[in-house]
Amino acid sequence: MPAFDTPAMMLILWAVIGYGLGSIPFGLILTRAMGMGDLRQIGSGNIGTTNVLRTGNKGAAALTLLLDGGKGAVAVLLARAFAGEDAAQVAALAAFVGHCYPIWLGFKGGKGVATFLGLWLALAWPVGVACCLSWLAGAAVTRISSMGALVAAASSTFWLVLLDQGAGFVLGIVLTLMVFWRHRANIARLKARTEPKIGQKSA
């Protein structure tokens, strides 16, 4: 019988917990609870904050942002408290994967931006704050939500080095690549100059 208190088993345990937390589809739950229908049939069909905003309910969008970010932060903080820093990083990655590929929705989830920001706020708050500001700046200057997300992700490894948080550098690269992968359709539209601006209907 395997020992469940070994380092490897603890990392697996926190990966499962992180995935479970990350896979909670708050955007879908909130829009259904508020009588707005199935979010997957609205706008882009994405379950994240930007698509919730397309319903016209800014409160629901703000709450989705906080909850999707919060689940990433909670996964990190719980893992760190009970199992240390390695487990926190594993839980962070698992929470991000859970949001993007939730088993409950046939592995069709969001793009992970809010969860990305939340987990960095918990892992290394100076990096998290810098990424949030980068996200806001990118979105404010371009008026394109996906551009803010890409700027935040691309800048994260820079902030990790600049703010002396190098322990998370490998995780930062992996998460950045995953954010870009999840936004590959947006990147194609950005190149074609057809990506909708904030407030516009999704193409």
Curated annotation (Swiss-Prot):
The chain crosses the membrane at residues 10-30, 59-79, 87-107, 116-136, 160-180. PANTHER family: GLYCEROL-3-PHOSPHATE ACYLTRANSFERASE-RELATED, INNER MEMBRANE PROTEIN YGIH. GO terms for biological process: phospholipid biosynthetic process. Catalyzes the transfer of an acyl group from acyl-phosphate (acyl-PO(4)) to glycerol-3-phosphate (G3P) to form lysophosphatidic acid (LPA). This enzyme utilizes acyl-phosphate as fatty acyl donor, but not acyl-CoA or acyl-ACP. Its EC number is 2.3.1.275. It comes from Ruegeria pomeroyi (strain ATCC 700808 / DSM 15171 / DSS-3). Keywords: Cell inner membrane, Cell membrane, Lipid biosynthesis, Lipid metabolism, Membrane, Phospholipid biosynthesis, Phospholipid metabolism, Transferase, Transmembrane, Transmembrane helix. It is a multi-pass membrane protein. One of its GO terms (cellular component) is plasma membrane. Pathway: Lipid metabolism; phospholipid metabolism. It catalyses: an acyl phosphate + sn-glycerol 3-phosphate = a 1-acyl-sn-glycero-3-phosphate + phosphate. GO terms for molecular function: acyl-phosphate glycerol-3-phosphate acyltransferase activity. The lineage of its organism: Bacteria, Pseudomonadati, Pseudomonadota, Alphaproteobacteria, Rhodobacterales. This is Glycerol-3-phosphate acyltransferase. Probably interacts with PlsX. Belongs to the PlsY family. It is found in: Cell inner membrane. InterPro entries: G3P_acylTferase_PlsY. It comes from the Bacteria.
